[in-house]
UniProtKB/Swiss-Prot annotation:
<dbReference type="InterPro" id="IPR007197">
    <property type="entry name" value="rSAM"/>
</dbReference>
<feature type="domain" description="Radical SAM core">
    <location>
        <begin position="83"/>
        <end position="297"/>
    </location>
</feature>
<protein>
    <recommendedName>
        <fullName>Lipoyl synthase</fullName>
        <ecNumber>2.8.1.8</ecNumber>
    </recommendedName>
</protein>
<dbReference type="InterPro" id="IPR031691">
    <property type="entry name" value="LIAS_N"/>
</dbReference>
<comment type="similarity">
    <text>Belongs to the radical SAM superfamily. Lipoyl synthase family.</text>
</comment>
<keyword id="KW-0411">Iron-sulfur</keyword>
<comment type="pathway">
    <text>Protein modification; protein lipoylation via endogenous pathway; protein N(6)-(lipoyl)lysine from octanoyl-[acyl-carrier-protein]: step 2/2.</text>
</comment>
<keyword id="KW-0479">Metal-binding</keyword>
<feature type="binding site">
    <location>
        <position position="97"/>
    </location>
    <ligand>
        <name>[4Fe-4S] cluster 2</name>
    </ligand>
</feature>
<dbReference type="InterPro" id="IPR006638">
    <property type="entry name" value="Elp3/MiaA/NifB-like_rSAM"/>
</dbReference>
<keyword id="KW-0004">4Fe-4S</keyword>
<feature type="binding site">
    <location>
        <position position="308"/>
    </location>
    <ligand>
        <name>[4Fe-4S] cluster 1</name>
    </ligand>
</feature>
<dbReference type="GO" id="GO:0016992">
    <property type="term" value="F:lipoate synthase activity"/>
</dbReference>
<dbReference type="GO" id="GO:0051539">
    <property type="term" value="F:4 iron, 4 sulfur cluster binding"/>
</dbReference>
<dbReference type="GO" id="GO:0046872">
    <property type="term" value="F:metal ion binding"/>
</dbReference>
<feature type="region of interest" description="Disordered">
    <location>
        <begin position="1"/>
        <end position="21"/>
    </location>
</feature>
<dbReference type="GO" id="GO:0005737">
    <property type="term" value="C:cytoplasm"/>
</dbReference>
Amino acid sequence: MTSVDTPTPHGGTPAPAPATANGRKLLRIEARNAQTPIERKPKWIRTRATMGPEYSELKGLVKREGLHTVCEEAGCPNIFECWEDREATFLIGGEQCTRRCDFCQIDTGKPAALDRDEPRRVAESVQAMGLRYSTITGVARDDLEDGGAWLYAETVRAIKRLNPATGVELLIPDFNADPDQLAEVFSARPEVLAHNLETVPRIFKRIRPAFRYERSLSVLTAAREAGLVTKSNLILGMGETPEEVTEAMRDLHEAGCDILTITQYLRPSPRHHPVDRWVKPEEFVEHSRVAEEIGFAGVMAGPLVRSSYRAGRLYAQAMAHHGREIPPAMAHLAEEGTASQEASAVLARFGS
């Protein structure tokens, strides 16, 4: 195995307000954000890359076959650990989102036409990579009559047809809580249905203006009522207080959320929301303790945890929590693996 330290980029100097990737003029909020320099990151925002044999094999295969994963294209710091365990994430629906969130690096604009062949290609990529667990996420497609519900559902169905032993987690937008669109998505029966709340009520409208706090909770409730394992994520460091985080966790649990991930906000560019503060590892440990006390079936919290991090393990924990058996073909997901970005592990490496 080869190990190297991979620090995330440091900032600290003002940058000129850039145009967006698709050339559109900056929004007023983006221009205001850009007046704040990119923040210097603390010592614990660092990951240790361990390039084991599974990772090296996948890396070579992805390059040879021209496959595309969010893991590589977004430069995720957890790629070494996830790929070593044969887990990966794919983005569907194109490169343009019809909504804008102030933390998200995906550009807002008019999306390309629906690519109805995309589910097949994603399923074949999952097969080629020999994945044990796959996460599918995507952009909001309010331009489509069904909001993209068919695309999300068909991608799950295509993966399952070609890869019956691979777990599938589906991270969805809210589809405006439309019952028919949600029913289409739920009918594909992913192992986990995720919808990320991301932040607390007080700052929700500012951070996610096209979403609604209560509507997001209702999506999770509907998924739980459909018999699915549910999951959500909270991003810290955007202006919330610890007390508000606890209340949001309670709201999520009451809405029927089984699995919770909690992470630190990392600013993608100067035009995105400035980092309000760097949440220390010990605070993540405390949030994790409170979440478990509230009753979540699976919790993963840490500065560099992402919503798809160790997703297979969290699914297995949720199934065990509810006394449900994991399908025999997916029994491998219950095996213990590393979780180097979990808060207690980060605290052990870097201290407070």
